[in-house]
């Protein structure tokens, strides 16, 4: 991978990912991009912290490291930390959030598969918080969020509120462990990406350690 500050002609936004806070700041994110040999593209963020070109070789995969400083770190704030994947051919991708004892991976939907209405499905018991986020792939995206449980930003359960985002912007919301966010609803005027997780989830509820 190399630093590269201009998109190649023909590159299309293929997918998007965000990192959610893990157990500590020692967590590291990894983006794995799969495609045909010779596929080229770039991985970018609006804030400029991530800007790398890639070429997929005979292995069929390219890898980009994403430091935890690029993860969404402030609940309720609009942030420019999303990782956008552009490529000149179709690709698939996964995002790994790696930390000892608490690693998870998300398969990333193609931008064409993203929708305008979602329900959150998440596990309510964790070491710290239960989290969900939304990321826009178009300017002027307005999402109406109806949380299933009370959020730590002060938003009460069942009362809708709007989030306004431009392309590459994200907002994350959190709840205390034990608060059920499953069923939280998103109704959006444009397609966006939604992610949900527990910060060091406890399964079963009372771990044996």
Spans of model-derived segments:
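Conserved functional hotspot residues at active sites or interaction interfaces
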Residues: 1-209
């Amino acid at each position: 991978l190399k630093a590269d500050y201009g998109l190649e002609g023909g590159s299309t936004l293929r997918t998007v990912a965000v990192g959610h806070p893990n157990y500590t700041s020692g967590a590291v994110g990894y983006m794995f991009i799969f495609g045909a040999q010779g596929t080229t593209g770039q991985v970018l963020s609006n804030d400029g912290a991530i800007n790398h070109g890639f070429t997929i070789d005979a292995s069929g995969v390219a890898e980009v490291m994403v430091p935890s400083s690029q993860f969404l770190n402030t609940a309720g704030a609009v942030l420019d930390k999303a990782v956008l994947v552009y490529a000149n051919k179709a690709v698939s991708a996964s995002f790994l959030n790696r930390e000892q004892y608490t690693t998870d991976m998300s398969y990333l939907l193609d931008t064409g598969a993203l929708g305008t209405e979602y329900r959150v499905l998440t596990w309510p018991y964790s070491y710290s918080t239960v989290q969900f986020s939304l990321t826009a792939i178009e300017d002027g995206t307005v999402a109406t969020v109806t949380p299933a449980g009370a959020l730590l930003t002060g938003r009460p359960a069942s009362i809708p509120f709007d989030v306004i985002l431009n392309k590459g912007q994200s907002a994350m919301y959190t709840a205390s462990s034990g608060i059920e966010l499953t069923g939280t609803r998103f109704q959006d005027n444009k397609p966006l990406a939604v992610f949900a997780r527990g910060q060091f989830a406890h399964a079963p509820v009372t771990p044996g350690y």
